[in-house]
């Protein structure tokens, strides 16, 4: 360290003085030197000093399965055992492939049809242990002919491994089907053109799990809405869509390239005349059957040893390098902690004192000057909004946290979505969307969607957590003769049944045995709140009137109906979108095979399509008893347990359905309701997502304040509907539900913050590694600086957490070479104290406590100082990368005897 010279430092000023020294110093000649300690001139980053750079032959690195030792072949090897080196410029496959994408409707995966891809996880799993795998649906090949909206069950069972391979790729070049090329069905191309973890695909062959060597999966964030395959589906111009996609591998024989190119120092283990061995501490994956490289991965002129590469498991790319490390110099990235070289060796040091200081104010400073601080911007993408990168700018100035929060939120609120702007109409499209103007002044589009961004910023001062929450907003209007936006079904009702029901069975007093039987009622043609909802008889409340029945809303029991009655087919499903068709029934095992049935024990099936040898064509009621897997379940006949009133249809009262108009003569609502069903077209939401409703009138005796508040989605019904549990309330009379209800819904909008640019607010907001290529968040509706980046694993964050920001009235300069303070709590080796002010100026000048360190006897040598700027609690100050400086006066004693005038 001592041989590293300070560069660009203020000159050291030396003054020999031929007189008596300061008090308490020996009376002899002294030398005063002023030294500027400036954190800008510390060594910021650790770095290596290199000797020879060796250019390796292409693909000269040899890998072995489950072995972290790699062998590098090089002729006339110049290295010896124990030498320190780093690997550099190691690369893997970078391929341009055409028409490889395929996805089935309802699938959670997109399949890449990539022959001999080489991304094997061989040796990581037990092929005979089926517990290591889970079945998945809708990933089999599409048929030769299909419709985009067909539901096409898989013919072959497929599985995915439950382990984690850490194999990833970067995908780019995917274009979409719609006019703006932004979507394939409901899948944003932004999602596809990104970093992905590869999901290996398996099938069961001869009792063993086998990985597909010719395709793999990428997991989606939603179920695909269409069937799609490159080269088959047509775009808006009715032409087949062809995709030429770039696949960049991030692994080489299973080893992440970040590990191979990490610039981590490696020690040569075994050096021979023509090779060296290194332990990279990450085992390779070498599949003996499905090789990593194939002949199609090379052009004929790129390399001349293709057979060796493939069969001997070589890699590394065309231009791998080895750098010989001669020395490692420690760096100090944090301006609050560093070692500072004084530029010379001071000897016989008698005293050191501080004489000036300049420190950044603890307030956050925002500016846009490229020559100074340039940190006033934010960049982001929206998942469902095309491949546009948005930019906003904050007005330069000094902000407290509350003012910064308001400024950021206002800047988002004034940024329209790109498709609503004048600039969107022009070509070519810009790389960065900024300073745009609305095409028309209305704030909502024709579908009720809000045209501007809504982003809330929450700052948790105690933990330095910053949370961005992004929302969309839509206004939905109740329209005549259309489904209501908000439907609140009655939870409990008293029904008066028709006397005709009793006539069907005269053996009992009531229309059904209330002690042993369960009555379900489903009314599609009744009032606004009760229609299309399932109700079941409440055995806990008895009525004296034999025709009055108390029923409760049932949203959990799924009922599938497929019968022939009155020479008409009656096919309907209640509480589920699954329809009883395309099934197979085994009457010996009572086993039903139905692709992706999504049923559970206790669900009910009413049908005459399950063939029973003793009652062919008869309607039976079945109860689901066991779920075998996602495609199979068992049932049992329960003819006497359940009775059904479904519209004008009676089931279970006789062998055949009985029909009459109006079996239910009167409906009286009881008590509180507890769910709302929201009609929100193409919502793209999930269970657990928060929404906020405003503007609604009272509905079905539920007060406005119960409806107009924040809610959590409890159930997804389909692409256009979801369910919410509402709080208890005091029912009101005279609901306004007959009026024209205009309802505003605020819902999560997944987006991605991008801090890879060097002029962002990221550091001020405590985000890590700002300005690096990895500083990009995943698509989330709520993004925190405590979360992982898109390509980052949790263990990679350990050394990157932000230090705690200053919240005291002063801080210390620690320096073990210049200790002057004692009895100061947890902080040791304190030299002096810097006092803070309430000024909003960028910097604090000369707020130090005058301090001097006297050495008696004189210090023989002083050449560097270990500096830490810390709080009284010992934690380092976070200057957000801003630097500081202070001046020291160093007094040395001269060996010369001073001359005294007579």
UniProtKB/Swiss-Prot annotation:
Compositionally skewed regions (Basic residues) per UniProt: 1-11
Region spans: Disordered: 1-24
InterPro entries: ATP_synth_asu-like_sf
Name of the protein this chain belongs to: Uncharacterized protein R481
Domain of life: Viruses
């Amino acid at each position: 360290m001592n041989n590293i010279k300070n560069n660009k430092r203020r000159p050291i000023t030396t003054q020999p003085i031929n007189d008596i020294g300061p008090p308490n110093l020996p009376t002899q000649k002294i030398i005063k030197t002023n030294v500027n300690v400036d954190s800008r001139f510390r060594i910021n980053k650790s770095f290596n000093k290199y000797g020879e750079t060796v250019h390796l032959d292409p693909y000269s690195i040899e890998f072995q399965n489950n072995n972290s030792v790699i062998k590098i072949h090089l002729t006339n090897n110049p290295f010896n055992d124990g030498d320190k080196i780093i690997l550099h410029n190691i690369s893997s496959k970078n391929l341009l492939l055409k028409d490889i994408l395929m996805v089935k409707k309802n699938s959670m995966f997109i399949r890449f049809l990539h022959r001999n891809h080489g991304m094997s996880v061989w040796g990581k799993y037990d092929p005979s242990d089926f517990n290591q795998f889970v079945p998945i649906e809708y990933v089999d090949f599409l048929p030769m002919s299909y419709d985009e909206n067909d539901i096409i069950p898989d013919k072959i069972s497929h599985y995915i491994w439950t382990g984690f391979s850490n194999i990833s790729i970067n995908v780019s070049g995917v274009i979409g089907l719609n006019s703006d090329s932004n979507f394939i069905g409901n899948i944003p191309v932004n999602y596809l053109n990104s970093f992905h973890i590869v999901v290996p695909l398996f099938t069961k062959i001869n009792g063993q799990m086998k990985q597909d060597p010719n395709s793999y999966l990428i997991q989606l964030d939603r179920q695909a809405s269409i069937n799609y395959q490159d080269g088959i589906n047509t775009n808006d111009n009715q032409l087949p869509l062809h995709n030429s996609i770039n696949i960049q591998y991030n692994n080489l024989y299973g080893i992440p390239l970040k590990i191979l190119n990490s610039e981590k120092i490696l020690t040569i283990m075994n050096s021979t005349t023509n090779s060296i061995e290194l332990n990279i501490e990450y085992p390779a994956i070498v599949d003996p059957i499905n090789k990593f490289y194939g002949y199609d991965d090379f052009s004929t002129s790129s390399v001349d040893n293709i057979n060796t590469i493939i069969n001997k498991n070589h890699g590394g790319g065309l231009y791998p390098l080895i750098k010989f490390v001669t020395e490692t110099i420690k760096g100090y990235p944090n301006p609050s902690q560093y070692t500072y070289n004084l530029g010379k060796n001071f000897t016989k040091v008698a005293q050191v004192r501080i004489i000036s200081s300049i420190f950044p104010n603890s307030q956050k400073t925002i500016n846009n000057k490229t020559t100074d601080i340039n940190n006033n911007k934010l960049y982001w993408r929206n998942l469902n909004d095309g491949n546009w990168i948005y930019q906003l700018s904050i007005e330069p100035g000094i902000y407290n946290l509350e003012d910064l929060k308001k400024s950021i939120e206002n800047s988002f609120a004034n940024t329209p979505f790109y498709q609503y702007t004048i600039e969107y109409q022009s070509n070519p499209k810009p790389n960065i969307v900024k300073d745009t103007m609305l095409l028309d002044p209305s704030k909502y589009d024709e579908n009720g969607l809000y045209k501007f961004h809504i982003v809330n910023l929450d700052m948790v001062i105690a933990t330095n957590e910053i949370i961005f929450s992004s929302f969309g907003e839509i206004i939905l209007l109740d329209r005549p003769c259309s489904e209501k936006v908000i439907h609140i079904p009655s939870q409990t009702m008293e029904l008066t049944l028709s006397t005709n029901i009793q006539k069907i069975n005269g053996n009992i007093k009531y229309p059904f045995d209330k002690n042993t039987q369960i009555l379900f009622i489903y009314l599609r043609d009744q009032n606004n709140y009760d229609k299309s909802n399932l109700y079941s008889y409440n055995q806990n409340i008895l009525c004296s009137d034999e025709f009055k029945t108390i029923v409760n809303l049932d949203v959990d029991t799924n009922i599938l109906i497929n019968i022939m009655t009155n020479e008409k087919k009656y096919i309907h499903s209640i509480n589920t979108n699954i329809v009883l068709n395309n099934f197979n029934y085994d009457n010996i095992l009572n086993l039903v095979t139905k692709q992706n049935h999504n049923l559970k024990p206790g669900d009910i099936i009413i049908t005459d399509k399950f063939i029973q040898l003793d009652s062919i064509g008869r309607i039976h009621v079945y109860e689901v008893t066991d779920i075998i897997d996602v495609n199979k379940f068992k049932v049992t006949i329960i003819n006497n347990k359940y009775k059904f009133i479904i519209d004008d249809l009676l089931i279970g009262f006789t062998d055949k359905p009985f029909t009459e108009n109006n079996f239910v003569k009167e409906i009286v609502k009881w008590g509180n309701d507890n769910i709302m069903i929201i009609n929100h077209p193409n919502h793209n939401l999930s269970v657990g997502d928060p929404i906020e409703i405003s503007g609604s009138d009272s509905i079905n005796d539920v007060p406005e304040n119960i409806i107009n508040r924040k809610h959590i989605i409890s159930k997804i019904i389909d692409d256009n509907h979801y369910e919410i549990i509402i709080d208890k309330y005091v029912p009101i009379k005279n609901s306004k539900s007959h009026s024209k209800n205009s309802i505003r819904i605020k819902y999560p909008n997944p987006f991605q913050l991008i801090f890879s640019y060097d002029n962002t607010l990221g550091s001020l907001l405590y985000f890590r590694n700002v300005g690096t290529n990895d500083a990009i968040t995943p698509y989330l509706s709520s993004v925190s600086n405590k979360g992982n980046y898109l390509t980052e694993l949790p263990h990679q964050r350990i050394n990157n957490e932000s230090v705690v920001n200053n919240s005291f009235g002063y801080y210390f300069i620690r320096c073990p070479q210049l200790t002057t303070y004692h009895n100061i709590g947890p902080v040791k080796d304190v030299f002096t104290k810097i006092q803070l002010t309430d000024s909003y100026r960028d910097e604090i000048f000369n707020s130090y406590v005058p301090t001097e360190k006297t050495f008696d006897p004189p210090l023989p040598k002083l050449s560097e100082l270990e500096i830490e700027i810390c709080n009284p609690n010992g934690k380092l100050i976070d200057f957000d990368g801003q630097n500081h400086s202070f001046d020291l006066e160093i007094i040395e004693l001269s060996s010369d005897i001073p001359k005294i005038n007579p």
